[in-house]
């Protein structure tokens, strides 16, 4: 792949990955001041979270950029010409087709459990403690409820956002902070924050039954 790049560009393979979701860029956009590139959806989500700063370097971003970021057309064109290796099966794929490949790559599915998503809602330790209370409630009210257990006999849990399973409580927290930090999740405004999280966790338990 380096030979393909060196022929007409100074880009490296890392330049084709979004620094927010850590996946191959999808509809790449570029900041005017610092020239950093992100997936369009990742950038707009980060703007709603952080306001006026670049998600990578905290540089300034104009109001116009926050609403309508400039597409990195030059990078899109290069991604259509240059191939990279799938991170799981090592198959050579054009970068602009890489995310589509992930959806059918069995090794990718086995490794990550779900095709690439943008990632995310940050889950705090307080939320995890809330989930502990919901576990007790679920076990009291559901006669057929049974926790999954790992080979070591400890209970395991399924991520309520991407459905990946076999997490301990701490690994579930780490997974959500790593993979779902900026994911937008539909919110029922009639429920308070703790009730929303408890509902998601209880649904996860029911899937594991």
From Swiss-Prot:
Pfam families: zf-C3HC4_2, zf_C2HC_14. Keywords: Chromosome, DNA damage, DNA repair, DNA-binding, Metal-binding, Phosphoprotein, Transferase, Ubl conjugation, Ubl conjugation pathway, Wnt signaling pathway, Zinc, Zinc-finger. GO terms for biological process: cellular response to leukemia inhibitory factor; DNA double-strand break processing involved in repair via single-strand annealing; double-strand break repair via homologous recombination; protein ubiquitination; Wnt signaling pathway. A zinc finger (C2HC RNF-type) spans 86-105. A zinc finger (RING-type) spans 18-58. Residues 125-154 are annotated as: Disordered. Interacts with NLK. Interacts with XRCC5/Ku80. Interacts with RBBP8/CtIP. This is E3 ubiquitin-protein ligase RNF138. It comes from Rattus norvegicus. The gene is Rnf138.
